[in-house]
Amino acid sequence: MQNITHSWFVQGMIKATSDAWLKGWDERNGGNLTLRLDEADIAPFTDDFHQEPRYIALSQPMPLLANTPFIVTGSGKFFRNVQLDPAANLGVVKVDSDGAGYHILWGLNHEAVPTSELPAHFLSHCERINATDGKDRVIMHCHATNLIALTYVLENNTPLFTRKLWEGSTECLVVFPDGVGILPWMVPGTDEIGQATAQEMQKHSLVLWPFHGVFGSGPTLDETFGLIDTAEKSAEVLVKIYSMGGMKQTITREELVALGKRFGVTPLASALALY
């Protein structure tokens, strides 16, 4: 029988966390990643589960996630080490039948626990399940360097930030036509920032935490990584533009509209209406 470490979901988490570290997005224990699974995904690996799974109560019940398994990164764990010891740095957890807590079925060895941002992840999963009819399964948080840098120099509002990212790279409007949500600065690891992030996730697949990082959501690990990677590439272009004296020309409103029509997406109206 195949070991769980060779499963598609453990291998996918290893690749995503390794790639994110190589990108420079996840220094030290920065960043966290969760993937919503189905019972059928984990059923072949019950022999690998802990004999006495630890139970941890959630700070607030999440009945929408009842009986749902997830694979998650651990609190205080370094992304660069996931590939070296998946069972120490990742965990498969399953929310209980009333959504009040979860059991750690596999991994998170040596009394480790899931990421401190689990409230933000689970609340965001709930919103993205509703927003996408269950298609979105991944929530990824990382410290994408250039996106963070832009939060210091651009006005932190959704229409402006979205419009500038669309202008920074032609593919951006196609990849995230719903724009980028932005929070005020908040203390991380709290229910409050989790609730605020989830509220923005009702409308946007990308949410910026100013001076901190970004949250992204998507149907697969590849799609979610690619979403953040696309926004971060545009942010890198913008950082270079602003360091060279600013834009002399850019993609116009009319061109953005034409781009949306060509690829069958509806651009965020408030970003289009800016100028």
Swiss-Prot record:
Quick check: keyword Metal-binding in the entry?
A: yes
- Names of the cofactor(s): Zn(2+)
Chain segments annotated as transmembrane: none
Keyword Disulfide bond in the entry? The reply is no
SUPFAM superfamilies documented for this protein: AraD/HMP-PK domain-like
Q: Which residues bind Zn(2+)?
A: 141, 143, 212
The record places the active site at 117
Q: Name one GO molecular function term.
A: metal ion binding
- What pathway is this protein a component of? Carbohydrate degradation; L-rhamnose degradation; glycerone phosphate from L-rhamnose: step 3/3
> Which residues are in coiled coils?
none
Single Gene Ontology BP annotation: rhamnose catabolic process
As its record notes, the protein acts as a catalyst of: L-rhamnulose 1-phosphate = (S)-lactaldehyde + dihydroxyacetone phosphate
Concerning CDD domains, the annotation shows: Aldolase_II (cd00398)
Q: Show the GO cellular component annotation of the record.
A: cytosol
Q: Which family does it belong to?
A: Belongs to the aldolase class II family. RhaD subfamily.
PANTHER family with a match to the protein in the record: FUCULOSE PHOSPHATE ALDOLASE, RHAMNULOSE-1-PHOSPHATE ALDOLASE
Quaternary data: Homotetramer.
Report what the protein is called: Rhamnulose-1-phosphate aldolase
Protein source organism: Citrobacter koseri (strain ATCC BAA-895 / CDC 4225-83 / SGSC4696)
